[in-house]
């Protein structure tokens, strides 16, 4: 009963720490589109794509899936931070930059999720 909760909790802690660290290091580089937020969403998309394909072909305990997907990726990626960054750009009249950021996050995340799936199938020889 407690293993699923512990799996999610541990994954969440690690994902949140990585998200915080990347935000600290990358967001100051290009504040108009904070690179930390972009990075965590793209990397999270890749990881979840790879993980979904992997776990679909794995006999591992479901707790590992909870650790990686629900815990780690759930805490690593961020829709709320993305949303406030877009609203802030819109409020400051930076419509073009807001549309660019939306495109990078949405299209990029979908591409990286597909790349994660493709990487698993390539590595696994499927």
UniProtKB/Swiss-Prot annotation:
Its recorded name reads Fluoride-specific ion channel FluC
Gene Ontology biological-process annotations:
cellular detoxification of fluoride
Gene name per UniProt: fluC
Q: Record's Pfam families?
A: CRCB
Function in brief: Fluoride-specific ion channel. Important for reducing fluoride concentration in the cell, thus reducing its toxicity.
- Which UniProt keyword terms apply here? Cell inner membrane, Cell membrane, Ion channel, Ion transport, Membrane, Metal-binding, Sodium, Transmembrane, Transmembrane helix, Transport
Q: Give a GO molecular function annotation for the protein.
A: metal ion binding
Q: Which InterPro entries does this UniProt record tie to the protein?
A: FluC
> The organism sits in which domain of life?
Bacteria
By sequence similarity, the record places it as follows: Belongs to the fluoride channel Fluc/FEX (TC 1.A.43) family.
| Biological source species | Acinetobacter baumannii (strain SDF)
* Catalysed reaction, written as an equation: fluoride(in) = fluoride(out)
Q: What is the lineage of its organism?
A: Bacteria, Pseudomonadati, Pseudomonadota, Gammaproteobacteria, Moraxellales
Topology relative to the membrane: Multi-pass membrane protein
């Amino acid at each position: 009963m407690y293993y699923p909760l512990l799996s999610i909790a541990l994954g969440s802690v690690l994902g949140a720490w990585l998200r915080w660290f990347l935000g600290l290091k990358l967001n100051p580089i290009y504040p108009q589109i904070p690179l930390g937020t972009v990075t965590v969403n793209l990397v999270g998309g890749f990881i979840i794509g790879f993980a979904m394909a992997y776990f679909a072909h794995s006999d591992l305990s479901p707790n590992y899936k909870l650790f990686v997907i629900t815990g780690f990726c759930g805490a690593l990626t961020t829709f709320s931070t993305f949303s406030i960054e877009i609203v802030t750009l819109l409020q400051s009249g930076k419509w073009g930059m807001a549309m660019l950021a939306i495109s990078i996050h949405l299209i990029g995340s979908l591409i990286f999720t597909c790349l994660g799936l493709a990487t698993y199938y390539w590595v696994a020889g499927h």
